[in-house]
Amino acid sequence: MEGKKQLLATLVGCNYAGTPHELRGCINDVLAMRDTLVARFGFAPGDITVLTDDDRSAAAVLPTGANIKRALADMVARAAPGDVLFFHYSGHGTLVPHRRGHGARQDEAIVPCDFNLITDVDFRQLVDRVPQGATFTMVSDSCHSGGLIDQEKEQIVLSTVVTDDLAVDGTTTRAARARFLPYAAVVGHLSGASGVDASHHVADHLLALFGADASAKFRHHDTPTPSPDGGILLSGCQTDETSADVAADDEAADGGKACGAVQAVLAAHPAPLSNREVVSRGRELLREQGFEQHPCLYCSDANVDAPFLCQQEEPAAIPAL
């Protein structure tokens, strides 16, 4: 309807079941976030696209690199000024070394179920297509997720928060695994299918396997001068940190610690919270629980204290999930 704000979401969870890289809680994260979007923020179920790699998923909706990028492109194409776009990702992250030069610099990427990496450059190009006046909020509970929108302004990172971020003594009764795939593991996995020697850069493997569907980072792309935009990244950790995937005694309670912190913060504060508050309160909760990862916020100055997902009022009632 003309004049009515659209609320659109794409939610992705990759557990990589049956592989050496299997995680436990990524699909649970997605299901919990879907319920929260509907109950708290008023998203219509039909406007939420869910891509997971469990047995219930048809090939057409598996979270491959191409399918994720297609879903995000379709969401942005539907958007108009004033709309609220949301992307949630739970799964492995990795760091990709530059192909030439730049010393030891590495860039951030997420790892879809087919290992067709989606990089910070892809997310930058996506955000650049968001209509002016719309917002694109991204929550990524993956390792090295800080900086996943290339050139987005740092607002809350470790050096900008004055708090006692010392390691907390103590243990948890639940097993935690990092949502991180080393670069060598990514190349090793791809080389078996690409036919390219494992000594080559990951770009050679991805271009051989996926062609035009490979990340723009590995093809020619322009690097525009950054300017304020509607991109908002809430990362599960800093770019040099890992994000924890926690296996609970009850399998239904498996999940990512960063996602769990966001859910807990939202549940404890039904009234609108700013992007800054969601990240800061999530950091404090993880610190209290003894997890050494630091969620971060990247966005324009105007969006730091804007309401998370543009929530304007407290929901009348949040049904039990």
Write out the residue ranges for each language-model feature:
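Boundary/activation segment at the start of structured domains
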Residues: 1-105, 230-231, 247-256, 299-321
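Caspase-like (clan CD) cysteine peptidase catalytic core
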Residues: 6, 61-90, 94-157, 167-174, ...
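Catalytic cores of nucleophile-dependent amide-cleaving enzymes
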Residues: 16, 27-28, 108-157, 194-220, ...
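Conserved active-site and cofactor/substrate-binding residues in soluble primary-metabolism enzymes
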Residues: 28, 257, 273, 277
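Caspase-like cysteine protease fold
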Residues: 9, 188-242, 247-251, 265-321
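Generic recognition of well-structured, leucine-rich alpha-helical segments
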Residues: 18, 40-44, 55-58, 75-79, ...
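Short, small-residue alpha-helix embedded
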Residues: 255-267
